[in-house]
Every structure is written in C-alpha cells, then in structure tokens.
C-alpha cells in the first residue's frame, strides 16, 4: 500500500467511516468488522507479475470466518462479514461488468454496506473516491431500472405487449 503497510491502510479506512443516524459515536458493527478484516487475506495471497495480492479477497473471507468463529460470533454475522470481505473488490468493476454477473450481489441487503466499505477503502488509498462514485452511480441506475415496470434491470425497454403481461419475450 502506498499509504504504508496493510495495517496502516486498514486503520486509515476507519477515518472514513460515517456514524449511523444522529448518534455521532455509533457505527455499524458489521461495517467496522468488514473494514478491519477486508485485507486480512493479503499476507496469505500470492503475487504474479503486476498482479499483487492475487486471490486475497477469497483467502481473507475464509480467514475472517475462522477468526470470527474463534471469537464466538454467531453464524449470521459471520456470513455477513464473509460477504463483505469476499466481495470488497467487486464494486471497482461494477460499472464495467454485465448485469448477469452483478445482479445477485447487488440484490443482497448488504450491498449498501459493501459500497460503504468500498468508499472507505478507496478514500484511504491514493486512488481517492472516484471509483466509489462510479460504482454508486451504476448501482443507483440498476435500482432505478429495477423499479421501472417498462424497463429490465439492465435498462433495456420492454416491448408494449410484454409490459402489459404478454409473453415477456418468451416464445
């Protein structure tokens, strides 16, 4: 990390956390654990050429599971942190990936927390928050299209007969 080592970067992400509601001292516990553990897989990962820390998200998710189990956290919380750590790199690619590859992840009730983790991660690095803004815009477009009965979730218009309950494009 240009900002130092992985630990320095991890601590830096906490500076960008936003409190929940009006209580300035209250933070989302899941997000805090996600920030703490999002790069835990980096020391376990391999590097090849210019691709440093290859596979660190997957390795980190497994390590986070073991760590949280050992501390006695319950399975639902562990599953939430697994989702955040495993997918923390995905928002960077969101604007360029086809909907078929991202729909399931964006449908998760945890996706807003994942975007927030990504914002903190990006803001604490030399990159800044531009990638977050692009990913957030892609997510907002997805949500807007999903709510529109005349568009598919990818934004394509539905034909008139399909919108009125026709064959929905099936033969």
Feature locations, PLM:
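Surface-exposed beta-loop-beta
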Residues: 1-8
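General structural feature for long, well-ordered alpha-helical segments within catalytic domains
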Residues: 9, 36, 77, 81, ...
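Divalent metal-dependent catalytic cores for phosphoryl transfer on phosphate-bearing substrates
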Residues: 16-129
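Charged substrate- and nucleic-acid-binding regions of tRNA-handling and nucleotidyl-transfer enzymes
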Residues: 66, 70, 110-171
């Amino acid at each position: 990390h240009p900002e130092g080592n992985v630990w320095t970067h991890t601590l830096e992400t906490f500076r960008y956390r936003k409190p929940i509601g009006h209580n300035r001292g209250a933070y989302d516990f899941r997000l805090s654990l996600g920030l703490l553990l999002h790069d835990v897989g980096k020391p376990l990962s391999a590097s090849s050429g210019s691709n440093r820390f290859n596979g660190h998200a997957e390795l980190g998710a497994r390590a986070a599971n073991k760590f949280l189990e050992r501390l006695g956290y319950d399975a639902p919380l562990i599953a939430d942190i697994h989702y955040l750590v495993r997918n923390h790199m995905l928002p960077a690619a969101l604007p360029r990936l086809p909907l078929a590859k991202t729909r399931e992840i964006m449908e998760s009730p945890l996706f807003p927390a994942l975007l927030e983790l990504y914002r903190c991660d990006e803001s604490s690095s030399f990159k800044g928050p531009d990638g977050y803004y692009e990913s957030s815009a892609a997510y907002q477009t997805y949500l807007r299209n999903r709510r529109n009965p005349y568009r598919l979730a990818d934004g394509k218009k539905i034909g008139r007969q399909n919108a009125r309950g026709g064959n929905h494009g099936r033969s």
